[in-house]
Each structure stands twice: as structure tokens, then as C-alpha cells.
Amino acid sequence: ASKCTIMTEAEWLNPKTGFNKANNSWMWYLPQSTEGIANLVNFAAWRSSEATWGYGGKYVFEGVTSNFYNEISDTDWRKRAFVGPDAKYADYSDITNLTAAQFANLPAYANLKFHPAEGETATYSVGNVTDIPMMRVEEMYLIEAEATAHADASAGLQLLKTFMAKRDPEFSTSAVSSADVVEEIIWNKRIELWGEGVVFYDFKRLNYSLKTGYVGTNVPSD
């Protein structure tokens, strides 16, 4: 049996090691070394909003849609991994390596999930040497919950509740039918595995749609 354990809040939001260093949750990952590290063609340079040498921390600032952010429960601590529209530095200073001045340049909804190695925000030869997550045990729990829900909605929901007890102490849902429970599971899978290249395939498999055109959207039409 796997000895992997679900990431804790402290591990998830750690500004020095969060999603840049393999831990007991990671079942499979891609390690990088200092040999051959480039400044731009690199995971952290694109994904991290703190990599000030890269596109991710200078121009792109990868993040979520406003609709996505607003749908995350305020009691779900994973929401802190994304910069709120009314964000104040004091509310994020414990989970970011940026200074107050640098933080002020982040657009709303930018991610603070992926950090440069060692929390290094200026030197690419250090900050780009991260481990890249490929498969985490959390995905396995959510796959089990979905598979169960297709056959038994109540049992699948219970598995989700057990998982969510480690993410949102006040988690609740009105989902009852198998279809609705599966949708709730996939929604939390979207939050949990954002930026890890997983849920796109769930959307294709389940024939889900993604809406980006709505009043208040932060997705440009062009």
C-alpha cells in the first residue's frame, strides 16, 4: 500500500517549498538539477507569479477566472493560493516571498500556489531548480470518490466529505444525485489540482463545458 499522505495546509501554502519540492503526497514528480537550467524555458518561470525573471512573474501571472475564485468557499484554505480582488499584502505575507511593493503589482486572481525553489524570487539559477509535480495521492482519493459516485452517490459523497475535512472544515453541498455528486467532486478536483495538468482530461471525458464569457469576467475576449 502507498505510504503517501495528503498534503497539509502548511505544506500547501509554504512559501519556501510549496509545490516546488517533492513531499510525501507526491507519487511521481520530475526533479530538476542546476545543469541545463534556463531562465525562461522552465516550469517555474512560467507558472510562478514570484519568478520575477520569467514570464510568469513579469507578464503572464497565471491565475484563475473571477468566477472560479468566487465559487471557492471562503472557509476553504486553498482559496488563499489565489490573490483576491481586494487583496492586502498583510493577508498574504505569510505565504508569499514577494515584498509588499512586488505584491502590489500582482493582478487579481494570480496564483500563489507555485513558488520558485527555496523561495528565491530574483536569481533564476536557484529559483528554477524545482521539482515538478506529476501525480499526487490527492488525485487518487478524488478518482476513487468519483468512481464510487457513479455507482452509489451517497458513498461517493461520503468519500468526498472525508477528503474535504482536510481542506474546508465547514464543507457542505446540496448534491444528491450521482451526476451532481460527480460534478462536486470534479469541482474540488479543479481546485486541488489547479495548474497540474489533470482536470482538462476530466472535462473531455465527462463532456463538461467551461464558461469564460460572463459579466465581470477577467478573461479578455481576444
Q: Which positions does each model-derived feature cover?
A:
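Acidic/polar-rich alpha-helix caps and helix-coil junctions
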Residues: 1-44, 53, 59, 69-222
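Residue-level signal for threonine
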Residues: 62-66
